C-alpha cells in the first residue's frame, strides 16, 4: 500500500468513527435577468482574488450561467467562512450552497457536523474523479504538493528531500513561512524521522534551524519577495505557487522530496442547511468538467483531479508529478491536526517565533 493510499484510508477510518426555482416565461418583455434564473440561484463561499475570478471564468460563466443558473460568490477568508458555517449550524436554512475549503478544513467542518455527505450519484462527472480526491464529505477540485524550493546559486547545491531542506547547516539560507505552520511542522517531522502524527522530532529540528539563523517570513508573498531578493536559498512551498513565481521571473526551482510530497487539496463541501442542494451538485459536476480542470491547470498551475483532463506535456512537466511521485503523495493526518492544532500553534508562536 502506498503512503498516499494509507493516508487516505487512515483518515477515512477516523471519519467513520467519529429551491427557489423561477419558472420560465415565454412572454414578450420578460427581462433577460429573470429568464437567466430559471434553474435557480447557487451561492458559493470562496476565497477572493484569482481563485474567485477563475471560478467565474472557467466554471460559472461557461458551464452554469450559460445554462440558466444564477451564481453568487460569498467571498471571504476560510477562517471567517468556517466561523460563519458554525454560527449558522442551528439554522434550518443557511446562506450558502457550497464552500471552498482545503482538505484539512473540509475534515474539520465534517468533524463539526455542519456538512452533508457527498451524494456522488448526483454528480455524473465523479466517475472520472481520482479515488484519492473522492472524500465522503467533500470533493477535490485541484491539488498540488509541498515541494522543496531552492535557488541553486544562493544555496550552493540542490536538495533532494525535506531532510536536505531542514538542515541547520543552511543557517540563514533557510526560509520558513509563518502561515504555513501546519505543513512546515509535518514536513520537518518527516525530515527528522517522525510521521504525520509524531511531530516532536520535527519540532526539535525546527528549533535547531532557528538557532542556526533560519528566516521566518509572515506570508507566501513575503517569502516570494525574499526569494526574489536572494535573501535565502531554500524552503518549502506548493509546486503550483512555484510555477507562478517562475512565470514572474523569480529565480527558483523545485523538486519532489524523497520522503513523499505533502499533498494540498482544495475542494468543495455542501453545508447541511444549504438552500439549493440541486444547485450544489450541479456546481460540483461543472467543476469536474475536463475543460474547467484543464483551464485551472493553465491559469493557476494546479493539477486536475479528474482522469480525463488533458494537460499539455510541457505544462505537466512544470506543474505535475510523475506516477511514482503521485503514488507517494502524503496526506496530513486530519484528525490529529484538528485535535492538536491549538497546541501546535501555541508552540509555533511561543517557542519557534518567540
Describe each model-derived feature in a short phrase.
Residues 1-11, 21-23, 35:
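N-terminal secretory signal peptides
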Residues 36, 271-329:
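Mature extracytoplasmic/periplasmic domains
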Residues 325-354:
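Conserved C-terminal helix/tail region of periplasmic/extracytoplasmic solute-binding proteins
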Residues 143-144, 204-209, 246-272:
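Periplasmic-binding protein-like
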Residues 38-102:
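Early extracytoplasmic/lumenal segment of secretory-pathway proteins
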Residues 49-56, 79, 94-231:
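Extracytoplasmic ligand-binding site segments that recognize negatively charged/polar headgroups
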Amino acid at each position: 500500500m502506498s503512503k498516499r493510499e494509507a493516508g487516505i484510508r487512515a483518515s477515512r477510518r477516523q471519519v467513520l468513527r467519529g429551491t427557489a426555482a423561477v419558472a420560465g416565461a415565454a412572454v414578450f418583455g420578460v427581462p433577460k435577468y429573470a429568464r437567466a434564473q430559471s434553474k435557480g440561484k447557487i451561492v458559493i463561499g470562496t476565497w477572493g482574488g484569482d481563485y474567485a475570478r477563475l471560478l467565474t471564468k472557467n466554471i460559472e460563466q461557461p458551464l452554469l450561467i450559460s445554462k440558466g443558473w444564477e451564481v453568487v460568490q460569498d467571498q471571504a477568508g476560510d477562517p471567517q467562512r468556517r466561523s460563519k458555517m458554525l454560527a449558522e449550524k442551528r439554522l434550518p436554512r443557511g446562506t450558502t450552497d457550497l464552500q471552498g475549503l482545503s482538505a484539512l478544513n473540509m475534515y474539520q467542518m465534517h468533524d463539526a457536523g455542519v456538512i452533508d455527505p457527498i451524494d456522488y450519484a448526483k454528480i455524473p462527472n465523479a466517475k472520472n474523479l481520482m479515488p484519492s480526491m473522492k472524500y465522503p464529505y467533500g470533493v477535490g477540485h485541484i491539488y498540488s504538493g509541498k515541494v522543496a524550493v531552492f535557488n541553486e546559486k544562493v544555496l550552493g547545491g540542490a536538495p533532494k528531500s525535506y531532510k536536505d531542506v531542514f538542515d541547520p547547516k543552511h543557517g540563514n539560507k533557510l526560509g520558513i513561512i509563518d502561515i504555513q505552520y501546519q505543513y512546515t511542522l509535518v514536513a520537518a517531522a518527516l525530515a527528522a524521522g517522525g510521521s504525520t502524527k509524531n511531530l516532536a522530532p520535527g519540532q526539535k529540528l525546527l528549533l535547531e534551524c532557528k538557532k542556526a539563523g533560519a528566516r521566518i517570513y509572515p506570508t507566501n508573498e513575503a517569502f516570494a519577495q525574499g526569494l526574489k531578493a536572494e535573501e535565502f536559498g531554500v524552503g518549502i512551498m506548493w509546486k503550483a505557487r512555484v510555477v507562478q513565481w517562475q512565470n514572474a521571473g523569480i529565480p527558483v526551482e523545485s523538486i519532489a522530496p524523497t520522503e513523499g510530497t505533502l499533498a494540498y487539496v482544495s475542494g468543495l463541501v455542501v453545508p447541511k442547511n444549504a438552500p439549493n442542494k440541486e444547485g450544489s451538485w450541479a456546481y460540483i459536476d461543472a467543476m469536474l468538467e475536463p475543460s474547467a480542470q484543464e483551464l485551472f491547470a493553465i491559469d493557476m498551475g494546479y493539477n486536475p483531479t479528474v482522469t480525463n483532463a488533458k494537460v499539455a506535456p510541457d505544462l505537466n512537466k512544470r506543474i505535475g508529478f510523475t506516477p511514482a511521485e503521485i503514488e507517494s503523495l502524503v496526506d496530513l493526518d486530519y484528525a490529529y491536526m484538528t485535535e492538536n492544532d491549538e497546541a501546535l500553534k501555541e508552540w509555533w508562536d511561543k517557542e519557534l517565533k518567540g
